[in-house]
Each structure stands twice: as structure tokens, then as C-alpha cells.
Amino acid sequence: MRVHICAVGRLRAGPEKTLIDDYLQRFDRSGRALGLGPARVIEVEDKKNAGMGAEADLLRKALPKGALICTLDERGKVISSPDFAEKLAGWRDMGRQDLAFVIGGADGIDPSLRAEADFSISFGKMVWPHMMVRLMLAEQVYRSATILSGSPYHRV
């Protein structure tokens, strides 16, 4: 199952991008034997003052056809890392070819796009900068592969 991180805005070179790239490369290596990956980031332009509706339209165009859509949103469900790993495995086992995680811009995800999502995850009640959400998601995607493979990376 291919993993797509569809996000508003361009992440410039820097420590966040370096970490995201590292976690996604690790995921690609560890997930391959599990039927997970590759992972890639799809960035859509952050249209200044265009609003969430315009961002939602760009995000919809970036979504792979037929992909399962999972939004990252403060209203989403808070789940543990092992539960997240089980979600990924379940979607893979259902025969889904593509999983698209959607990360909105500074104002979040347009309600119409949130309504189209198959699932929504929250990283807690706090609001996180959307660039940090990318990093946390990349780490959790990698962590999921290690949990599913029995690697000692995730300690309980």
C-alpha cells in the first residue's frame, strides 16, 4: 500500500525536511516486506488569502484516485501508536492500494474535505504547526512499520 502525505505549503531545506526524509526512507526500507510503501510527500501551493476552500480543491487534485483518505485534524481521533499501526495494517489487508494523509494549511482543512475523509487522526488536543505535523506523521508511519515487523524501535 503506497502512502502519500498530501500537504499544503512547501517545506524548505532544513532540519524538519531532513528528519521527514529520513523517517520516510526508513519506512520505505522496513515497510517493503510488510506490503507498505513507498511513501512520498505531495505538496500543494499555499495560496495566500485564498482560504481553506481553495486549498481543499488543490488537495483533492493531489489525491491519488481511489485512495483511502485520512485527515490530520484536531477534531480527529486520538489513537496510540500500536493502534495506528493496526489501522495501517487493516487498510493494507483490505486491499487498499493507496493511503493519502491530508494535512491542511495554517487554518486547517476545509469542512467539505474533512467530510470526505474515511478517517481522521489527531495528535492530541493541542494545535500543532502544519509543518510539525508532517514530521510527527512521518515518524509515526515509520514507527508503525517497526511495530508490525516486531522491531525493538517501539518500546512499551
Swiss-Prot record:
Enzyme kind, highest EC tier: transferase
Described function: Specifically methylates the pseudouridine at position 1915 (m3Psi1915) in 23S rRNA.
Subunit structure, interactors included: Homodimer.
Xref: Gene3D superfamilies: 3.40.1280.10
A GO CC annotation given for this chain: cytoplasm
S-adenosyl-L-methionine keyword on record: yes
Keyword Methyltransferase in record: yes
Protein name (record): Ribosomal RNA large subunit methyltransferase H
